[in-house]
Amino acid sequence: MYTIKTLNAISPVGLAKLPANQFEIDNEAAAPQGILVRSADMHDTPLPDSLLAIARAGAGTNNIPVEDCTNKGIVVFNTPGANANAVAELVVGALVAGSRNLVDAVNWAQTLKGRDTIAKDVEKGKKAFVGPELRGKTLGVIGLGAIGARVANAAVALGMEVLGYDPYISIDAAWSLSRSVQHCVTLGDMLPRCDYLTIHVPYLPTTRHTINAQTLAMCKDGVRVLNFARGELVDNAALLDALNSGKVAQYFCDFPTEELLGVKGVCCTPHLGASTPESETNCAVMAAAELSDFLKNGNISHSVNLPDVSQPRVGGRRICIIHKNAPGAISAITSILTEAHLNIENMVNKGKKDVAYTLLDVTGNVTDDLAVKLGAIEPAIRVRVL
């Protein structure tokens, strides 16, 4: 029986993927083996020795102390793509709403309540909210992952010319893209051509302030910028300067901050990207499945701090070892198994930066002290025997 602690409300459809005869959901557990989390900040949350894995029902893991988890042999999962449709739909809606000035128009229309001259005032006032159609305009998409590819394809369907920039595009994402999406080798190739610009990359130290004074200077005057990925991807100070100069006509984002609120030309939604029932369910189901497969079988899929390693069970016992990605690690592991007269039926080893994961199926008499012996080798971080 595994104990799972939830730090946020998790869709019951997702929790149903953790059968009650194998998993206990205890939100007050002091020593859980797994944690399910959405947006709760875990940086000040103690990580008990019992904890084997954290599954984030969402894509970003900024709220999780990933490095500390890695050092303790705790696997951190996320759910890439589970909320992609929800975010992509919101971006398309923001493209339309922003271009046609719908937010300001709706707010203005509300001020007409109680007047006897509403029809007349509407005809007179609507000219203040005239905005361009999307058809025939050019959209630049930075990042062509699950969300960016969907946005690009939707924009093509709306009749836009779509330019894409992603030096790390995956094969799956490339296959999913419309042939009409034009590939740009550099931002310099793309930015001067865009009427609209949207960014869809993960937040990393290397992507912080991707939209900055330098990149904005490359854009054509009057560009409309959208950010439904992470607030830190845009340098707000540079963005506000560009708004004041007319370089940027509008900034539509999902991350309100004190400096952005109330600024003319800025539309902020309250982090609605994944806020749909379908998205929450998809993320919860995926997170629960990842957590279950790891706890029961040692398989890792969609981890942010360890390599993806998965293999079917072939009988016997399974040994799961998180260790330093260092020379001699595999030799040390197999030497101990040989001394224990265990036969390796199947083995997978993969590394990810400084850490590696080895999954072994063995036959023979697995004694209680095997995990202790394996854990004593210098490269070992954490050992489980299933």
Predicted regions and their residues:
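An N-terminal-biased, well-structured beta-alpha scaffold segment characteristic
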Residues: 1-79, 212-214, 218, 224, ...
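Rossmann-like adenosine-cofactor binding region
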Residues: 43-45, 163, 167-260, 275
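Phosphate-binding beta-alpha-beta segment of Rossmann-like dinucleotide-binding domains, i.e.
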Residues: 80-138, 299-304
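Oxidoreductase and adenylate-handling cofactor-binding alpha/beta cores
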Residues: 88-107, 153-160, 285-299, 334-338
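Glycine-rich Rossmann-fold phosphate-binding loop(s) that bind the pyrophosphate
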Residues: 144-145
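N-terminal Rossmann-fold NAD(P) dinucleotide-binding loop
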Residues: 148-149
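Rossmann-like dinucleotide-binding domain for NAD(H)/NADP(H)
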Residues: 213, 221-313, 357, 386
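A conserved regulatory-domain signal marking ACT and ACT-like small-molecule sensing domains
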Residues: 301, 305-386
